[in-house]
Amino acid sequence: MLVHPQIDPIAIQLGPLAVRWYGLMYLLGFACFILLGRYRIKRNPEGAFTISMLDDMLFYGVLGVIVGGRLGHIFFYQFGYYLEHPLEIFAVWQGGMSFHGGFLGVIAAMALLARKYHLRWLVVTDFIAPLVPLGLGAGRIGNFINAELWGRPTDVPWGMIFPYVDNIPRHPSQLYEFALEGLAFFTLMWIYSARPRPVGAVSGMFLIGYGVFRSFAEFFREPDEGFMGMMTLGISMGQWLSLPMILAGVIMLVWAYRTQAPVSARGKAGKAGKAANAVVAGKRGSKER
């Protein structure tokens, strides 16, 4: 049996300014996004993306993550609490972010970015999908440090007691999610995106991969208390929100392989691909790739 180390959530205290581990984990995730993105761009200098565009992606993405993630947490999990404590809506540094809300926020943000640069939306989402999982994993480490989102009671040897909760051994579900949504998911997306595939396939695989990993991890995670934490049929809110992702991912993969031209890992279509994409490119302008 293990005991949670009860790490101080404040990493650095500079007078009245407190830098929390949770915020540092988000910064680590954004740093991984930039480093991996730069690596992919340098490997494909003739591709659709540049370093300056990557900086814009990060800016748009951060806004999408923070706004969407916070609103998702409020409406999906703790609506009643924030209705009674509206000022705490803005205390994002204390934790309380929803992946599914952040995902919707990023989707909207990338649509705006694609429009700005005259790119196909799926080309943008295919590019960023492999850059995201390590950030998700970093966020789960932040959850573990904060001693939040703990697991369900268990009798496994590695069960962990969270003193802030009770004295019952529980699954360290934050670490499970770090391994699944962070490391395993990153490996899957990085390898898959490096192979020839049609436009939209990487985005579809992202939806399926995250949905499956998250749904599996939810069996070990204590359902969130409050508004819509546990839904019908014994399925948690996280699982209900992941099911549409999996379905949409399957549909997107089938659509991509049936209608889109094969594209190499460097973003170059073959002869058949160029012909198949000519109509799409003509509709969106000569700059769209």
From Swiss-Prot:
Per the record, membrane topology reads: Multi-pass membrane protein
Query: An example of a Gene Ontology BP annotation on this entry?
Result: lipoprotein biosynthetic process
Q: Which keywords describe this protein according to UniProt?
A: Cell inner membrane, Cell membrane, Membrane, Transferase, Transmembrane, Transmembrane helix
Work out whether the entry's keyword set contains tRNA processing: no
Q: What is its main location?
A: membrane
Top-rank taxon: Bacteria
Membership in a protein family: Belongs to the Lgt family.
HAMAP family the record matches = Lgt
Q: What is this protein called?
A: Phosphatidylglycerol--prolipoprotein diacylglyceryl transferase
